[in-house]
């Protein structure tokens, strides 16, 4: 039932609105379904039903927001050029443009390439400064802010970055499958420990089955984008159809990382327990070893080890090698776009510390 509800929200609500907007010659962007877990939906599928999937980041989210990672993932998976983001929400007058730039940079590094600024344009008074018409929220991005008349270079920078990050094809090594147990969204505690130097997208069953195929050991999308490895989130619950598709990918050489599922996610599929168990055994082998590697066709399945170990065994080199600080907040984020004659890397030093180090890029292009 929950899967049916999620499909209806994606197709009949967001899909219908998207069709109506297309017929009327309008763009349609939506924060589908947003951060809430109280809606029985599929965030990636729903975002894939709109012309411009949108996430959001708030000024207090200094360590990043995975909502924008969902939006950029949906844009990549469903072949959409723009991954939008509600930007700088609740930024206060005490925030400087330097503070806002660091927020913008991590959003760009998470895959956003359009900012819809959260601000209140309605400010009719000329004698009330700084003035606030945001219903209790701080909306500092208006003409009464002391830096407003000097902020053009800040906005020009955002426009240039967004323009560059719409060019070419995204380069993302890892596709993390979130399973099929609505509500489905990216939850950080269910992600494996992500190895530095590798970027990732997240997908759900609709995109996995209907948009991906295997080619030369990679997961390939219709527009030519590819992933090097399929990764299962922790305690990943999946349908028999998803399991079949994953097995087909592995047989054709796609490496898989993650633990074996215990049983079908849907009660309706319990009548197919025998086939489900056979598929699990084909992928993970007999017995229940805590860690191991199992071969199926041309591909390998890894579990019980770190993701970094599995990537090393598959000889998938980091896309970028750079220095991060010793503190959790001293992170480096990046995104990468591939063009016929050049690679575009955008790197965000997401800290207030200055690092001096060499950066190694995985590219054979003359220009990067």
List each language-model region with its residue ranges:
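Carbohydrate-binding surfaces of carbohydrate-active enzymes
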Residues: 1-368
């Amino acid at each position: 039932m929950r899967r049916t509800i999620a499909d209806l929200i994606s197709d009949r609500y967001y899909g219908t609105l998207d069709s109506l907007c297309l017929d009327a010659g309008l763009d349609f962007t939506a924060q589908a379904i947003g951060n809430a877990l109280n809606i029985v939906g599929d965030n990636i599928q729903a975002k894939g039903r709109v012309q411009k999937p949108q996430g959001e980041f708030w000024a207090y989210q200094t360590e990043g927001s995975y909502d924008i990672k969902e939006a950029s993932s949906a844009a990549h998976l469903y072949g959409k050029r723009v991954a939008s983001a509600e930007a700088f929400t609740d930024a206060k007058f005490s925030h400087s443009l330097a503070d806002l730039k660091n927020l913008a940079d991590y959003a760009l590094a998470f895959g956003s390439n359009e900012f819809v600024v959260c601000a209140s344009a309605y400010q009719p008074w000329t004698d009330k400064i700084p003035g606030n018409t945001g219903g209790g929220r701080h909306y500092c991005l208006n003409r009464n802010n002391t830096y407003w008349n000097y902020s053009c270079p800040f906005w020009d920078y955002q426009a240039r970055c967004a323009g560059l990050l719409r060019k070419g094809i995204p380069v993302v090594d890892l596709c993390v499958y979130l399973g099929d147990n609505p509500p489905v969204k990216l939850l950080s505690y269910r992600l494996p420990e992500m190895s530095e130097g590798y970027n990732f997208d997240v997908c759900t069953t609709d995109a996995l089955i209907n948009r991906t195929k295997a080619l030369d050991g990679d997961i390939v999308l219709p527009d030519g984008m590819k992933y090097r490895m399929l990764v299962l989130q922790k305690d990943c619950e999946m349908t028999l159809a998803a399991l079949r598709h994953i097995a087909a990918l592995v047989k054709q050489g796609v490496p898989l990382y993650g633990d074996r599922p215990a049983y079908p996610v849907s009660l309706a599929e319990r009548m197919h327990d025998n086939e489900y168990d056979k598929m699990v055994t084909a992928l993970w082998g007999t017995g229940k070893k805590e860690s191991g590697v199992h071969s199926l066709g041309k591909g390998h399945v890894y579990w019980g080890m770190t993701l970094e170990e599995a990537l090393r065994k598959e000889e998938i080199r980091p896309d970028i090698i750079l220095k991060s600080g010793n503190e959790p907040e001293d992170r480096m984020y990046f995104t990468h776009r591939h063009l016929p004659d050049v690679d575009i890397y955008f790197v965000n030093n997401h800290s207030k510390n200055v690092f001096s180090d060499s950066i190694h890029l995985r590219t054979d292009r003359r220009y990067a």
